[in-house]
Structures are given as C-alpha cells and as structure tokens.
Amino acid sequence: MSEPVLQVKGLKTYYYTEEGVVPAVDGLDFEVEPGETFAIVGESGCGKSVTSLSILRLIPSPPGKIIDGEIIYHGQDLVKKSEREMRSIRGNDISMIFQEPMTSLNPVFTVGQQIGESFRFHQQMGKAEMLKKSIEMLRLVGIPEPEHVINDYPNQLSGGMRQRVMIAMALACNPKILIADEPTTALDVTIQAQIMRLLKQLQEKMGTSIILITHDLGIVAQIAKHVMVMYC
C-alpha cells in the first residue's frame, strides 16, 4: 500500500469571538491516498470548509487559529510552515476550487490573466508562454473556442463556464491534491453532472488526489473511494 499523500492528525481549529471560543474543528483525523477521491460530508456548520481552509492555512486570524494537530504533506507538517513557504505550496502542490465561482473570480481581470497568474508565480513563465498554457488549460476543461474565451471577463460567462475556469486555474500547475469545496453549488443538475464527470476525467489523466467537500451523497456514491462524515 502506498504512503498517504496527506495525513491530518488531531486537527483543532478554533475561533475566538466576543461571545466565547468556537471549536469549529475539534480533533480531526484522516488521510488521503495518492490518486483517490476522498469525500467529506456533513451538515452545514460542521466544519467541512474550515477543514479545507486549515489544510491550506487560509484561516482568517483573528479570529481563527489552528491550536493543535498536524497536517502532513510529503513528510512535512504544514502547520509549522511559514507564510512564505505556504505561498509556494498553494496552487502548486495543493489547490482549491471554491464554492461560488462568481465571487471567487476577480471581475476586473480577464480569464487569461487569472489562469496565467499561477504560471507566472510558480513557474516564472513569460507572457507568450503563459498565454499558450492558459489556452491549453481552457481546452483541457472543455471550454469551446478557448482562444476567444481567454480574453473574456467572468461576467461574460455562464455559471458552468465559470466553474470550468476555476477548475482550469486550480489544475494549472498540476497539483498533487485538489480540494473541491461544493464545486457544483448554484449549478443546475445537468451542469453539475458535467462538472463532476470532468473532475473525474481530469483526475484519471493527471493522477491528482481529490478532497471533495459536499452534502450530496449521490455524488459521493459515484466517485468517492473513502468518505468521512462530520457532525456538529
């Protein structure tokens, strides 16, 4: 059996508010195998999204703080990493698709500028190469006429197209782990099925491990190898 690509041990993430301490995540343990889909399910408010933000060290502080536990990636504890070290990991080794693409995409930058940012920051590409790779990523996620879409702004795209752009951004640097936080929220049923099928196809092609956060057990039954249930 291969070594887990990610191990979370005894994770505790608390929020310190005026009304007291809120244990958003309180002693969480799980591991993710290479190339698998690991699903996290549970009711709203149980800590699913806080878990994903903790892995990427994106908990807003204050009021939130990881007070205990380990997040082991390739033998290194991400909890002990500096912010500078985490910036080199986010989007490169571990990437994330957020719940709502309209609020996650920047409305004042084109699709090409936003996908290209990952290539510029992590791979130091020039403009011409960035443009070429960005078009390739749009084509990979099934967007028609990527040479034209690359110059569009998010408001010019449908919800399904925006989510495909988010997937292209997340997979741009071929991460080892992709965290998909409710990736089909606010999409109609037909588009939901297309997006999940796309994620599965890309996973098989790129060998990426997926942490799928959802409350849809139908989706989980179709694509997940292991499931973790969280509760309040």
What are these regions (language model features)?
Residues 1-232:
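ABC transporter nucleotide-binding domains
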